[in-house]
């Protein structure tokens, strides 16, 4: 029946350029079709015509009845089926060889270009390593001797699968129409020149029926493999697309990790820069580096001090607060306009609107800084925090909350508060506080005549409920700050009518207080003058 070596050699070449399902299909084609057909089926159909006998002596009747019973021999039918079903694979193999040749030329061109780059003495080590990896990859591709299944080659592969599937279905239908699923031993022939109906007998009908069912089963399995291969290619393409998408998202996550995943062990910091603060509200920081921007107009000086708590901006006149997060630096930049801008009443953060502004018991444990309002021509000021003591031992003296009230240009009362660190030597002067207390009676009558009062400028919570002291810059911890409620309330009421704004400025290793007094001249205007207590750097306020 001819030699199958040529067809087998070509199909073996196709085997190297197929998918795993395609290789299974080729294995079934080789073993269960070509081998079975050559070794066993030929002998079964060898005496097909000679053993076909009819009960008539009419010349030509046997030939006519045999031709009617077997329009085409099943052996030749199966050979044609193998050739036609394999022909799309041969076409694909031709295209694959063409692409392989073009791929080899491109590989040689790339290899020559990379070798030319290697001869350049100005290449750095990283570039040389990259070129070496590329050369090794090209050599590996040469050993594989295979073209990547993508692009037009992939389309050709899918097309050849569809074509052989259609041919497989066609041959299965043809075999069923010609012979069905069973070979009958008796065939009645009514073709002329046979007289009437002639009985003809088929040799080895049972054996032929078995081979017929076997070939039908192999054809059905081949068709199922073709369908599975199409699904395999589609699923693989979808998975490749999803993998590329997930890889790109992974790269984006690595290049830009979220802010909440960044952890820092450095001390918290506070920076003061230029903008107009409106309202300052507290936040709680957990071992993260934070930057707070509080604006001082006409000044480019920036102080950087430890910040135990985080500040954010929340406008008191209904404006929308905003903040900027820098994910790469791990800092929070808070832009705050002037805390005195607007004429609305002062409010303390962490309290409801119906709460008293002077009740320290109503303040939240996380709140440590309040807000104040004033005329828009007021001088801007910067609010800092105290630097924690470098001494890890507790000082035993609490911080004192001082409140002072004064009048603005409209006659409304203003209140300011500050924490005085008694543990620091020289943090305040006794003479200055004595003067403030002595002037209480003089300003008390003026403050009592005011019709409208605003909430505290700087309001601090109960530090007796503070969870734990925050670490200083040197890594030490300060002691728990305990508040003496009665002395604080007394001093707050004393400074409530003192008419002085006392503002703290803290630099690393320096504790500085600035007192701003407003004095009325004969015309009713207020003059600003500043006093610096225990100061190293001078601070100016521009009215």
Curated annotation (Swiss-Prot):
Cellular component aspect of the GO annotation: connexin complex; plasma membrane
Gene3D superfamilies in the cross-refs: Gap junction channel protein cysteine-rich domain (1.20.1440.80)
Entry's localization field: Cell membrane; Cell junction, Gap junction
GO biological process: cell-cell signaling; detection of light stimulus involved in visual perception; gamete generation; synapse assembly
Source organism superkingdom: Eukaryota
Location of the region described as Disordered in the Swiss-Prot/TrEMBL record: 306-359, 379-424
Listed Polar residues bias regions: 344-359
Membrane topology: Multi-pass membrane protein
GO molecular function terms attached to this record: gap junction channel activity
Stretches that traverse the bilayer: 17-37, 77-97, 166-186, 210-230
Protein purpose: One gap junction consists of a cluster of closely packed pairs of transmembrane channels, the connexons, through which materials of low MW diffuse from one cell to a neighboring cell. Involved in tracer coupling between horizontal cells of the retina. May play a role in the regulation of horizontal cell patterning.
Name of the molecule in the record: Gap junction alpha-10 protein
Naturally occurring in which organism (per UniProt): Homo sapiens (Human)
């Amino acid at each position: 029946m001819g030699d199958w070596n040529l067809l087998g050699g070509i199909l073996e070449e196709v085997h190297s350029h197929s998918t795993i399902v395609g290789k299974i299909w080729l294995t079934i084609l080789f073993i269960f079709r070509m081998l079975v057909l050559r070794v066993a089926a030929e002998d079964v159909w060898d005496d097909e015509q000679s053993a076909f006998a009819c009960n008539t002596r009419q010349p030509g009747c046997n030939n006519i009845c045999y031709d009617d019973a077997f329009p085409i021999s099943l052996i030749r039918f199966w050979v044609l089926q193998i050739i036609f079903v394999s022909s799309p694979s041969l076409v694909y193999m031709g295209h694959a060889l063409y692409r392989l040749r073009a791929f080899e030329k491109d590989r040689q061109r790339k290899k020559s270009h990379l070798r030319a780059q290697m001869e350049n003495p100005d290449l750095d080590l990283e570039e040389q390593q990259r070129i070496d990896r590329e050369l090794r990859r090209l050599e590996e591709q040469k050993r594989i001797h295979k073209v990547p299944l993508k692009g037009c080659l992939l389309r050709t592969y899918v097309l050849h699968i569809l074509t052989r599937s259609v041919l497989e279905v066609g041959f299965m239908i043809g075999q069923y129409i010609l012979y069905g699923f069973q070979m009958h031993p008796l065939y009645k022939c009514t073709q002329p020149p046979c007289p009437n109906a002639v009985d003809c007998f088929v040799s080895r009908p049972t054996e032929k029926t078995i081979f017929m069912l076997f070939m039908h089963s192999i054809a059905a399995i081949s068709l199922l493999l073709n369908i599975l291969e199409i699904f395999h290619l589609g699923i693989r393409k979808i998975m490749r697309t999803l993998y590329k998408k997930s890889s790109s998202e992974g790269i984006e996550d690595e290049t830009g990790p979220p802010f909440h995943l960044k952890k820092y062990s450095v001390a918290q910091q506070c920076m003061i820069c230029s903008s107009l603060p409106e309202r300052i509200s507290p936040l709680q920081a957990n071992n993260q580096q934070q930057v707070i921007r509080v604006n001082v107009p006409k000044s480019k000086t920036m102080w950087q001090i430890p910040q135990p708590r985080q500040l954010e901006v929340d406008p008191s006149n209904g404006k929308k607060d905003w903040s900027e997060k820098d994910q790469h630096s791990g800092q929070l930049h808070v832009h705050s306009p002037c805390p005195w801008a607007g004429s609305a009443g002062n409010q303390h953060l962490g309290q409801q609107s119906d709460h008293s502004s002077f009740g320290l018991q109503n303040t939240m444990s996380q709140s440590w800084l309040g807000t104040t309002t004033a005329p828009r021509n007021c001088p801007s000021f910067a609010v800092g925090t105290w630097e924690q003591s470098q001494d890890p031992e507790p000082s035993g003296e609490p911080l004192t909350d001082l409140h002072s009230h004064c009048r603005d240009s409209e006659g409304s009362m203003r209140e300011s508060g500050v924490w005085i660190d008694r543990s620091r030597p020289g943090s305040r002067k006794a003479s200055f506080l004595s003067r403030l207390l002595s002037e209480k009676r003089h300003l008390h009558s003026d403050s009592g005549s005011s019709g409208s009062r605003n909430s505290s400028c700087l309001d601090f919570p109960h530090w007796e409920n503070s969870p734990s002291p925050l670490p200083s810059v040197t890594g030490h911890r300060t002691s728990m700050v305990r508040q003496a409620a009665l002395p604080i309330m007394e001093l707050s009421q004393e400074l409530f009518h003192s008419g002085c704004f006392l503002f703290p400025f803290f630099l690393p290793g320096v504790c500085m207080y600035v007192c701003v007094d407003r004095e009325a001249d004969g015309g009713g205007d207020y003059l600003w003058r500043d006093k610096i207590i225990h100061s190293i750097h001078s601070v100016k306020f521009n009215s």
